[in-house]
Design a protein with these regions (language model features):
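Charged/polar, solvent-exposed surface patches and flexible loops
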Residues: 45, 75, 97, 117, ...
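SAM/dcSAM-binding transferase cores
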Residues: 1-11, 15, 23-32, 38, ...
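A generic structural signal for alpha->beta connector loops
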Residues: 79-81, 105-107, 159, 185-187, ...
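Alpha-helical subdomain
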Residues: 139, 166-170, 243-251
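C-terminal substrate-binding/active-site "lid" region of AdoMet-derived donor-dependent transferases
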Residues: 140, 146-210
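A short, flexible beta-alpha/helix-coil linker loop
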Residues: 22-25, 134-137, 162
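The AdoMet/dcAdoMet-binding core of the Class I SAM-like
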Residues: 9-11, 16, 33-158, 196
Length: 251
């Protein structure tokens, strides 16, 4: 799939665009390994949901963009093996040239494919699946279907978590959330929208997730100390929105 790729810079931030003003990824030039956009940080809440200190060991990222999530996991989780699926080789080239995508075939495997086709033709499982794939108009296409979410579930390990970037202000948002819930037998939770309008949905397979917001805050402090990523504002917003019934994050 050929995409019109634009690279822009303003106030020290480099952004990726697919022929429109829609931001497909961003990198602060002085801190290329950090997560610049709010929704990418919120997707990393998934790292707090399993107590195993080695989690995640196997990660699948569908949609490369500016490689923000890929770079963060690559740098901060050196034991993790990363599979990245991107439909457009031009996006991969842009990520390498402008966004410092690492070249490490031992740990980072790039697949030029549609995410749905890739899942259909592999028997692998992952501890964490991150879905963030849109076209120039913000459409996820086949990556927002019941069949796709069922495939994601089938490819999760017993510790498996899926995090999906949805557009909370889009007309089909509620239908997207319902598709995820149905695919995961109700084991899904949706965060309140970021200021950008992005909403992150989480779903789980295998072992149950049941942890208090207090425990999540403790885990967030440890993550901040280790990686510099501060998820405490995200958890505070989650608490204020009363998203977690009884103060429990359950999947």
């Amino acid at each position: 799939m050929a995409t019109s790729i634009d690279i822009r810079e303003e106030a020290g931030v480099r952004t990726l665009h697919f022929g429109s003003d829609w931001i497909q990824g961003a990198m602060r030039i002085a801190r290329p390994w950090n997560l610049e956009l709010d929704y990418t940080r919120e997707m990393m809440t998934s790292l707090l949901l399993r107590e195993d200190s080695r989690y995640p060991r196997k990660v699948l990222l569908i949609g490369l963009g500016s490689a923000s999530l890929t770079k963060f996991l690559y740098r901060n989780y050196p034991l993790a093996k990363l599979d990245v699926v991107e439909i457009d080789p031009g996006v991969v080239a842009a990520a390498r040239q402008f966004f410092k995508l690492p070249d490490d075939p031992q740990r980072l495997h790039l697949h030029i494919s549609c995410g749905a086709d890739f899942l259909l033709n592999t028997g692998k499982q992952w501890d964490l699946i991150l879905v963030d794939g849109f076209d120039a108009l913000g459409r996820a296409g086949v990556l927002d279907t019941q069949t796709f979410y069922l495939m994601c579930r089938a490819h999760l390990s017993e510790q498996g978590i899926m995090a999906v970037n949805l557009l909370g202000r889009s007309r089909g948002f509620k239908a997207s959330v319902e598709r995820i819930r149905e695919a995961f037998d109700g084991r899904a939770l949706c965060f309140p929208s970021c200021d950008s309008g992005n909403t992150i949905a989480f779903a789980a397979a295998g072992d149950a997730v049941e942890t208090s917001l207090l425990d999540l805050k403790d885990a967030a402090r440890e993550l901040k100390e280790r990686t510099g990523l501060n998820l405490l504002p995200t958890l505070t917003r989650l608490e204020q929105a009363q998203t977690c019934e009884g103060g429990l994050f359950t999947l």
